[in-house]
Regions:
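Two-component/phosphorelay signaling modules centered on CheY-like receiver
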Residues: 15-35
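Short amphipathic alpha-helix used as the core "switch/output" element in two-component signaling
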Residues: 45, 69-81, 100
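Hydrophobic/aromatic residues positioned on beta-strands within the core alpha/beta folds
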Residues: 87-89
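A Lys-centered signature of the CheY-like receiver
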Residues: 113
Length: 137
């Protein structure tokens, strides 16, 4: 794996989820550097220091100190080319801020938890392909 490969970040305060997703993506998605954080503030700091080599940020909706919506808004404001996935065990359809951010392109995709690995891989692959197209422009 080259240090020029883009980052894919998983940010979820649940350590078991973070570890599972990190291992699964590291083993199955190639040509990326997978990093994971249980503290959204640390995840945002890493992104800020490396924002030009990020392809994708996957964030859980409900986290202490900085929720997924706030985190992904900061990510997109800092680098609009980075793709974003919001995941949650809660219903997105009634969250007006979520709907607004989807419409504005702050959130590129959403995943309902629990999620199968097949759905996770497909969504991540789709967003990485979109990232390559965006970064090529």
């Amino acid at each position: 794996m080259s240090s020029s490969n883009p980052f894919v970040s998983i940010v979820d305060d649940d350590l078991a989820t973070t570890k599972l997703f990190h291992e699964a993506l590291s083993e199955n998605i190639h040509n990326v550097r997978v990093v994971s954080f249980t503290d959204p503030v640390l995840g945002l700091e890493h992104f800020s220091e490396n924002k030009d080599v990020y392809a994708l940020v996957i964030a859980d909706l409900r986290m202490p100190s900085l929720n997924g919506l706030e985190l992904l808004k900061k990510v997109k404001t800092s680098n609009p080319k980075v793709r974003t996935i919001l995941m949650s065990a809660y219903n997105f359809d009634e969250d007006l801020l979520f709907l607004k951010y989807m419409e504005e392109g702050i959130i590129d995709s959403a995943i309902d938890k629990p999620v199968t690995m097949n759905i996770l891989f497909q969504r991540v692959t789709d967003e990485l392909q979109a990232s390559q197209l965006t970064r090529a422009k």
